């Protein structure tokens, strides 16, 4: 047996003596339940039943209510004792009506003597039966596996403090010695010392004197040995990442959050120096709403500066797919909550687990009272390149700058010496960045720091071989290491994560619905604001609650699609309810209102039960509206025949194009009559399907070699001409695989250069990816993409590993590939993933992942996108405006607009301010231009939190700038 094995064996013997006394509680009773809402449960049994040691307990993905009564032995009254229960579930424990704390797989005991008076103890336990994320659990299909467990009993126990202290010492030293990060000589010294110390203990007749002798030996021979010098400075911030939905529903996160908060509060009771950072205003809101007594306790710790709200946002959203205004509202509603409840403006954005960060974020943060940005995955999860900085300055699309921290190791650690050293070793800004940040605490399902982590932290200073550590708050770490630091490097660009690229496409219905609701909310707020002049009351609370619900569903494991089936159903139910309320707010009328702040020039589909076109299951007609910006107008279905188009088999002539189709609907030639050029080079409008088996992170990832495994799509019904009216001509083709059917309706227009593709899909695949590919006859080395608040240009060559890693990127309403003189745009209604190489771009349409949701994306789909060849580049062709027209329908409502003309600035939002004093107007420069807009009256200049910071009657804007104005009521 090797020396370290002999040490570990005796260490196991020692841990058996942590409890000097254990008294079993034999009166446990249980009844099972299913959680149906945040605080409501469906009980499976009318009465409690006995729960004995050795019984199986908990139902799949279920809740259990457990109770017990116990009379404390007389000799323990007034002494320190604890409640001991080992479980794989997540438990919230009340004793004599007091919340004593939480028990879960990461901790098995609660100190009770400070929370329970007298000898009579009444236990009330609520437990949720969790499963590890890697067990491929689906609550509806797995009825047993990974869900039930054996009850190991509950005890009133007394901790032998001498043994426990020695256990912490050895735990820390073994980790340091066996990890190899501190060197062989140090490891050998520790192994010799531990062996000698444990030799002082008679394990057949263990006594406290032997334990104290072993501890003294370790102090004098290992901790006192300063021959081994460490280097570096590491800031330790206690934290727990809490997914508000993931492998559990949102309703379960209420108790996950409470358990986490309770655990950290109880650690603060025991350790006066302990501090903890907790994100997401929404999680504080749920404590306030459902557990007001704990919220009052929480507020006291916040006032002390020990329980620290971090992350200025309402939830930790995905930062790729939500549009600019959604991210602004995350800050507005998050900061508003922290200000109202705690008197704090949180100066940092804390998003450790998001899947990359849009280039538009720095400006949003800077104008929302946020100076610092913390994320993590780029430094720890990239699959190709090592992100070059950890502490740096992040420059946004408009030139705004925020301090940024991307710690070099994972945001979930258990605070071991080896993890601290690994963090320092991986830290890339040692000379410029000051301390490196290490978060410690269990996460994903909450839980946070443990007693062991705090005890180890207190011992770190004894190990001279370790970096210098400081337990601090998140905000103090950021202020200390960033403010005034002129040595920091600058990263100018998006924070692209070289992983999880599939989340741009997975659960495509969620993404399309989110897009639709974002624009519905914009229009509902705009129209409600305009109606104030007519004496109508602005529905502030209703709109705020809808926005909050939308923001919750933009959480980074909901909107990206990385969750179980019930989470998807909850989100879709929310979306349907939000849509219904927004329709009511938008209202109806005799005329159509153009909510865009520019004249509509593009083709539009008008729902009409008498129409002769069926689009996405709704009758209607296409027309080219002539309605000015923010104005009303009438629209008629102009009757006429299709004499504007000539069809000869698969050859088609329109006013704009000469087109040659293939039988499968792909375009062999697209000759532009106006520009006298061919647009096709290679496969164009070609559906391509690939095997999509990324491994462990099924819903998250797409592998770079997916093109190596194509799948056959057969032609079931070749292209046929359906017919034409005065404005639109339709063609249909049906494709199929062994399991799925795919109808493509191709629409050509008399008065539009756009070519619309409607897809009607019966999707029943597993591990497949479908893209629509467009090989364009343009010489371009970049793909221009919409970010929702400006444009980003991405290289389409593969010269470096950085470009090779970006084989799939996120865009918003459109992407464009152009050369001098013309290009081709792809405009979508809710598809975010796109790839581009050379002169070929491919829009990702559907995936078919099975983990964590085996039913992901299965069923019927109906979606549209548009090919738009154009003269000039994307800016001169006004592709952004065309994309807005494609995404924002005309609203049938009667209202008059009194807003001024804002020139070429996009009218992003119009709303009543949160305090009711202003009409808030948010404008965004989308094309990279400078300019001036003169206002007819003076307006307040606001930040994104709606604080007044100035006054102006003239807007001098710069590229990609977001401007917020307040017009007084």
List each language-model region with its residue ranges:
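Histidine-centered catalytic/metal-binding microenvironments
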Residues: 1-39, 150-248, 518-629, 633, ...
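Aromatic-lined ligand-binding clefts that engage carbohydrates, nucleic acids, or primary amines
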Residues: 77-95, 123, 593-595
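C-terminal (or distal) subdomains of carbohydrate-active enzymes
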Residues: 361-366, 376-380, 388-391, 424-425, ...
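Catalytic alpha-helical scaffold of carbohydrate-active enzymes acting on polysaccharides/glycoconjugates
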Residues: 218-236, 255-271, 286-345, 359-367, ...
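Catalytic grooves of carbohydrate-active enzymes
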Residues: 173-203, 241, 245-247, 399-589, ...
């Amino acid at each position: 047996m090797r020396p370290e094995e002999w040490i570990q064996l005796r260490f196991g013997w020692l841990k058996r003596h942590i409890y000097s006394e254990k008294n079993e509680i034999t009166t446990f009773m249980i009844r099972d339940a299913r959680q149906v809402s945040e605080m409501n449960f469906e009980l499976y049994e009318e009465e409690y039943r006995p729960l004995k040691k050795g019984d199986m307990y908990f139902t799949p993905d279920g809740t259990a209510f457990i109770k017990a009564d116990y009379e404390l032995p007389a000799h323990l009254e007034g002494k320190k004792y604890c409640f001991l229960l080992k479980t794989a579930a997540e438990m919230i424990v009340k004793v004599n009506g007091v919340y004593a704390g939480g028990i879960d797989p990461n901790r098995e005991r609660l100190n009770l003597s400070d929370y329970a008076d007298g000898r009579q103890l009444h236990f009330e336990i609520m437990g949720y039966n969790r499963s590890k994320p890697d067990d491929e659990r689906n609550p509806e299909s797995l009825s047993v596996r990974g869900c039930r467990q054996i009850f190991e009993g509950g005890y009133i126990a007394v901790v032998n403090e001498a043994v426990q202290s020695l256990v912490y010492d050895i735990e820390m030293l073994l980790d340091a010695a066996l990890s190899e990060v501190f060197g062989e000589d140090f490891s050998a010294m520790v192994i010799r010392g531990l062996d000698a110390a444990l030799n002082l203990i008679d394990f057949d007749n263990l006594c406290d004197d032997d334990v104290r002798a072993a501890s003294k030996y370790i102090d004098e021979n290992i901790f006192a040995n300063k021959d081994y010098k460490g280097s570096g400075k590491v800031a330790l911030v206690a934290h727990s990442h809490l997914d508000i939905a993931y492998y559990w529903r949102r309703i379960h996160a209420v108790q996950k959050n409470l358990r986490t908060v309770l655990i950290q509060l109880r650690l603060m009771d025991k350790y006066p120096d302990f501090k903890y950072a907790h994100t997401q205003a929404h999680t504080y809101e749920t404590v306030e709403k459902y557990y007001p007594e704990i919220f009052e306790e929480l507020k006291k710790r916040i006032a002390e500066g020990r329980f620290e709200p971090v992350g200025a946002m309402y939830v930790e959203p995905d930062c790729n797919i939500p549009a600019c205004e959604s991210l602004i509202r995350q800050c507005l509603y998050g900061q508003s909550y922290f200000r109202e409840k705690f008197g704090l403006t949180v100066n940092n954005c804390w998003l450790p687990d998001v899947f990359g960060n849009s280039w538009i974020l720095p400006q949003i943060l800077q104008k929302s009272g946020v100076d610092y940005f913390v994320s993590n995955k780029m430094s720890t999860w990239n699959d190709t390149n090592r992100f070059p900085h950890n502490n740096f300055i992040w420059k946004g699309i408009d030139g705004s700058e925020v301090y940024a921290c991307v710690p070099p190791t994972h945001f979930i650690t258990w605070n071991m010496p080896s993890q601290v050293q690994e963090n320092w070793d991986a830290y890339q800004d040692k000379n410029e960045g000051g301390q490196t940040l290490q978060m410690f605490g269990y996460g994903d399902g909450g839980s946070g720091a443990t007693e062991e982590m705090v005890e180890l932290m207190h011992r770190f200073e004894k190990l001279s071989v370790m970096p210098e550590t400081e337990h601090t708050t998140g905000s103090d770490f950021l202020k200390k290491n960033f403010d005034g630091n002129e040595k920091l490097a600058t990263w100018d660009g998006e924070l692209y994560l070289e992983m999880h690229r599939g989340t741009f496409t997975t659960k495509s219905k969620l993404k399309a619905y989110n897009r639709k609701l974002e624009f519905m909310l914009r229009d509902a707020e705009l129209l409600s604001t305009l109606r104030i002049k007519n004496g109508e009351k602005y529905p502030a609370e209703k709109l705020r609650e809808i926005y909050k619900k939308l923001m919750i569903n933009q959480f980074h494991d909901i909107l990206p699609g990385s969750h179980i089936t019930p989470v998807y159903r909850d989100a879709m139910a929310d979306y349907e309810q939000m849509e219904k309320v927004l329709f009511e707010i938008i209202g109806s009328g005799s005329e159509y209102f153009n909510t865009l702040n520019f004249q509509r020039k593009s083709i539009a589909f008008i729902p009409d039960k008498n129409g002769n076109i069926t689009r996405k299951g709704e009758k209607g007609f296409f027309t080219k509206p002539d309605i000015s910006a923010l104005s009303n107008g009438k629209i008629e279905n102009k009757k006429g025949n299709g004499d504007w188009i000539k069809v000869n088999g698969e050859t088609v002539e329109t006013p704009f194009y000469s087109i040659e189709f293939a039988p499968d609907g792909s375009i062999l030639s697209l000759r532009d009559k106006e520009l006298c050029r061919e647009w096709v080079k290679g496969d164009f409008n070609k559906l391509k399907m690939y095997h999509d088996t990324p491994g462990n992170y099924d819903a998250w990832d797409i592998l770079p070699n997916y093109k190596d495994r194509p799948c056959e799509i057969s032609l079931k019904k070749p292209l046929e001409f359906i017919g034409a009216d005065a404005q639109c001509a339709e063609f249909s083709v049906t494709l199929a695989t062994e399991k799925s059917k795919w109808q493509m309706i191709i629409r050509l227009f008399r008065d539009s250069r756009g070519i619309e593709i409607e897809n009607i899909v019966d999707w029943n695949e597993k591990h497949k990816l479908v893209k629509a590919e467009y090989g364009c006859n343009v010489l371009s080395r970049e793909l221009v993409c919409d970010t929702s608040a400006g444009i980003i240009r991405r290289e389409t060559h593969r010269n470096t590993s950085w470009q090779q890693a970006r084989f799939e990127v996120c865009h918003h309403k459109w992407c464009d590939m152009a050369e001098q003189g013309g290009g081709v745009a792809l405009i979508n209604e809710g598809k975010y993933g796109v790839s581009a190489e050379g002169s070929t771009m491919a829009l990702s349409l559907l995936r078919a992942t099975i983990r964590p949701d085996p039913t992901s994306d299965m069923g019927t789909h109906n979606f549209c996108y548009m090919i738009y060849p154009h003269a000039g580049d994307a800016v001169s062709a006004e592709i952004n405006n065309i994309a807005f027209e494609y995404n924002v329908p005309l609203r049938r409502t009667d209202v008059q607009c009194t807003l001024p003309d804002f020139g070429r600035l996009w009218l992003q939002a119009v709303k009543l301010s949160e305090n009711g004093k202003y009409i808030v107007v948010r404008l965004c420069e989308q094309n990279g231009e400078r300019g001036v807009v003169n206002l007819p009256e003076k307006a307040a200049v606001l930040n994104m939190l709606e604080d007044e910071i100035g006054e102006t009657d003239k807007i001098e804007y710069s590229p990609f700038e977001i401007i917020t104005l307040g017009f007084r009521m």
